[in-house]
Structure formats: structure tokens, C-alpha cells
Amino acid sequence: MLVLGVESTAHTFSLGLVLDGKILGQLGKTYLPPSGEGIHPREAADHHSKVAPVIFRQLLNAHGITASDIDVIAYAAGPGLGPALRIGAVFARALAIKLGVPLVPVHHGIAHIEVARYTTASCDPLVLLISGGHTLIAGFSEGRYRIFGETLDVAIGNAIDMFAREVGLGFPGVPAVEKCAESADRLVPFPMTIIGQDLSYAGLTTYALKLWKSGTPLPVVCKSLVEAAYYMLAEVTERALAFTKKRELVVAGGVARSKRLRGILEHVGREYGVAVKIVPDEYAGDNGAMIALTGYYAYRRGIRTTPEESFVKQRWRLDSVDIPWFYDLCEEVVLNTSTKRRP
């Protein structure tokens, strides 16, 4: 079964292919907003509509397949930017009608988790999902991912991106801020807001800008900002590990590329005797492969829709989605691991 995945939730339009549960490849292009500005949803949508047919042709040609080979189309139905989501959905619907194949709506955040589980050979981990649009800790229980802590306002990636934009470091903000932080000679105290297991990052950005405008050297502000942001994550992750007793920690989402954060989380893993597994860089950001992979498992469990009944949801909580395929992926992990261990 060949599944095409369509990702268009924010600044990236990407298509991915999965054949019988194996990722074949992906291809995408990212909308870059004007310098000093955030994402303009309608401009991102215009970008996606222009690049979609080009990426589709290039992806098929790269793998020597034709459109008629596609059996299922999975698309990111949310959460995300409304105009951008609709472009991906329209593309998926039109192609499904033309090819006469079913559609599978996929939750973008769950797709991040599933591709991380798949690529790190993890079965039942505690998950830290961190990106421009997500900051949460989750674990599987009773048919769904249950959230053990999340941001109360903006996601960590968005918070750092906003700071980077305001101080002229460009987009994406996380690598730019971390690069700037390398030349810092000290740290300054930052307020860290943790309420129970939940986090607040909006105030962190505001405080960082206040420090910078008051004359604190930019590298010092950058270093202090990322250290505070990451140690907030580490604290709530430690608590969740202690509560859930999970033996694996999987880190998913674009911010998982951060080498500094990896070091902090690996230290947490050593303290708790937990294996820390981080999604490979190529699947950390938004990508069509994660949509295709999740769509593949969902379709096998009977989840599908028609073009007429397909939908998009700008706001869609991760813990509202049933995951009937959860242990199917576990079986795949066990099979692959045991195969690799054979002499």
C-alpha cells in the first residue's frame, strides 16, 4: 500500500511517501516571511498553492512512480493556520477525487510523535513534543495520548522565534539564538513560570526583550533565554518521568534539533535510568513523511473519509484523538529490533 502524505499546517508545504509502513522519502519547500516579520497565513497559503504541483511531480519522479500508484492520501487536518491548512486539504481532496482513492485526516502533532516513535524504535515512551506550535509532555493511556503538561500560552519554538525576530536574528529563531548564545560570557537570572506541570513562555520572551532594550549584551540575553526555556522543560519532564515510570523518553518536533537541549535531556535520562531517544533531524520539522506514516497506520485501523466529508481544524487538541493503531507500531518496533539483533 502506497500512501501519500500532505503537510501544510504552517510555513512548510511537504509531501511524503510511505510504502507498506516504510518511509520512501519526502520533499518540501518552506515559506520565508519578510525579514523582521512573522508568518502571514494568507501569504503562506499562496506559497503552498504555487509549490504544491511542482513538489508533487518532483517527488513522484524521484521515486519512479506515477500518480496512479497511490492507494491512499493522508493530509494534515490540523491544528495549524487556517489558510495554509485549507490549501493542503484542497490539494488532497482534488487528488483523491481524480485518483478515486480514500482520504485519511491526520493530527499534525500526533504525526510528529509517530514518526519519532518509528525512527527511534520506541514503543511506549514518555513524549516531549516541542516545536513552533507545540510544547507538551504526553504518554499513551487508555486509547489516547494523555497530556502530563503543556504550555499555557505560546509554544517554546514560537517564543524563541518571536525574540529572534524582534532583535534581528532572523528565522528560524532557535538555531539563530543558540548561535548568538555561544559568545556569551555569563548568564543572568530569568523568571521561569511553571504552574504544576504547565509552562508559560510568553513572559520569558517579554523579559528577554526588556533586558536587551536595557543594554544587556545580546549574546548574554540569548544564552540566558535558552537556558531558562530548556530547564523549564527539563523540570516538568523529570516530574512526568517520576509519575509515569516510563523507561523511554522520546523527543519530537523541530526544537528537538537543539544540541543544547539534547544535552540537558540526556542528563535527565542518566539521572532516571531512562533511554533518551531524539527524532532524526530530517524528520524533526514539519514533513510529509510523518503525515503519510501516521495515515498508513490509521488507514489500516479503518480511519478514512471522503472528499465531501473531509475537514480541517485550526484548533485540535492532541488528547481528543483516538489512537487505535498505537500497538501496531509497537509490534513493528519489536519486529525490526529483533531482526537487527539476529546474527
Swiss-Prot record:
Primary site of residence: cytoplasm
One cellular-component annotation, GO: EKC/KEOPS complex
Gene Ontology molecular function terms on file: iron ion binding; N(6)-L-threonylcarbamoyladenine synthase activity
EC number: 2.3.1.234
Catalyzed reactions: L-threonylcarbamoyladenylate + adenosine(37) in tRNA = N(6)-L-threonylcarbamoyladenosine(37) in tRNA + AMP + H(+)
Binding site for substrate: 129-133, 161, 178, 258
GO BP annotations, alphabetical order: tRNA threonylcarbamoyladenosine modification
Cellular localization per UniProt: Cytoplasm
Necessary cofactors: Fe(2+)
Cofactor remark: Binds 1 Fe(2+) ion per subunit.
Keyword Transferase belongs to the record: yes
Taxonomy, superkingdom: Archaea
Family matches, as PROSITE patterns: GLYCOPROTEASE
Binding site for Fe cation: 108, 112, 286
Keywords from the named record: Acyltransferase, Cytoplasm, Iron, Metal-binding, Transferase, tRNA processing
Job of this protein: Required for the formation of a threonylcarbamoyl group on adenosine at position 37 (t(6)A37) in tRNAs that read codons beginning with adenine. Is probably involved in the transfer of the threonylcarbamoyl moiety of threonylcarbamoyl-AMP (TC-AMP) to the N6 group of A37.
Family statement drawn from the similarity comment of this UniProt entry: Belongs to the KAE1 / TsaD family.
PANTHER family hit by this protein: TRNA N6-ADENOSINE THREONYLCARBAMOYLTRANSFERASE (PTHR11735:SF14)
Designated name of the protein: tRNA N6-adenosine threonylcarbamoyltransferase
Gene that this sequence comes from: kae1
